[in-house]
Amino acid sequence: MGFSVDCSECYSIEPDSSDITIYLTINHNYRSIPIIVYKDQVDDNRIEYIDTAYSSPYYLFVPVNQYYSVKAEYSADGKTTYAVDGDKLNTKHVSESCDVECWVVTGGVMDVRLKYE
């Protein structure tokens, strides 16, 4: 199956919302990062949420069974760099792996950390 289940993390009913996790570069050069979270792809321009992140990881509670994208804006020394990533936040019914009714949430992890500085 390739999917490991921790039965202690089960939901007894299918959740309708959960957290997406966004990893950002936060340091002395980049103390605050404007982010835009989109439903679907960034190019679809379906804005879900706009904020400024001051720590990483950044969590946002959103509806499940949806693809989300994030665009982070890094500005320093008059230069701006954008980082983009996306992932689907899913629910999965895995009761056959546990002794109880079990729903888990998978995905929803985005990494918009700078690869270089």
Which residue stretches match the model-derived regions?
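First exposed extracellular module after export/assembly in secreted or surface-exposed proteins
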Residues: F3-E117
